[in-house]
């Protein structure tokens, strides 16, 4: 397995698909990286030469924010929004959907498990 940006990418898949295993790289960015490195997208990772792998590593490390750096940046952005107490920050604090989704009947994933509300107990006559 080739190792790029501290991620083992699968050998038996096409290069453009393998690059999407790296956090922060989607199919569009993967195709863009292949074009910059002048490597065919359809080439399998196991047939890449060492020079091609080095070229890929250099492009990804120098021009893109991926893996730990990107995760850290996202976390810091969320923390900043919480600190300034803007609307999105408040939604994060309350663990509710941030981007305007409905919460009346949906958003179970974000809100957590449903909690039953105790109603009046029926009396037997």
From Swiss-Prot:
By its UniProt entry, which SUPFAM superfamilies does this protein fall under?
Answer: S13-like H2TH domain
Molecular function via GO = rRNA binding; structural constituent of ribosome; tRNA binding
Q: Which top-level group of life is the source organism from?
A: Bacteria
Report if keyword Kinase is assigned.
no
Q: Where are the transmembrane segments?
A: none
- List the GO cellular component terms: cytosol; small ribosomal subunit
Q: Name one GO biological process term.
A: translation
What are the protein's UniProt keywords? Ribonucleoprotein, Ribosomal protein, RNA-binding, rRNA-binding, tRNA-binding
What NCBIfam families does this protein's entry cite?
A: uS13_bact
* Assembly description: Part of the 30S ribosomal subunit. Forms a loose heterodimer with protein S19. Forms two bridges to the 50S subunit in the 70S ribosome.
**What does the similarity note say?**
Belongs to the universal ribosomal protein uS13 family.
PANTHER family the record matches: 30S RIBOSOMAL PROTEIN S13/40S RIBOSOMAL PROTEIN S18, SMALL RIBOSOMAL SUBUNIT PROTEIN US13M
What role is this protein assigned? Answer: Located at the top of the head of the 30S subunit, it contacts several helices of the 16S rRNA. In the 70S ribosome it contacts the 23S rRNA (bridge B1a) and protein L5 of the 50S subunit (bridge B1b), connecting the 2 subunits; these bridges are implicated in subunit movement. Contacts the tRNAs in the A and P-sites.
In Swiss-Prot or TrEMBL terms, this protein is called Small ribosomal subunit protein uS13
- In the UniProt record, what gene is named as encoding this protein? rpsM
């Amino acid at each position: 397995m080739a190792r790029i940006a501290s991620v083992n990418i699968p050998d038996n898949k096409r290069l453009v698909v393998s690059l999407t295993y790296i956090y922060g790289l989607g199919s569009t960015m993967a195709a863009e990286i292949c074009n910059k490195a002048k490597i065919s997208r359809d080439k399998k990772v196991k047939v890449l030469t060492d020079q091609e792998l080095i070229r890929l590593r250099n492009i990804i490390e120098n021009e893109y924010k991926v893996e730990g750096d990107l995760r850290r940046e996202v976390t810091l952005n969320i923390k900043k929004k919480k600190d300034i107490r803007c609307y999105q920050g408040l939604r994060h604090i309350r663990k509710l959907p941030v981007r305007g989704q409905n919460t009346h009947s949906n958003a179970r994933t974000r809100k957590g498990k449903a909690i039953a509300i105790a109603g009046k107990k029926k009396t037997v006559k």
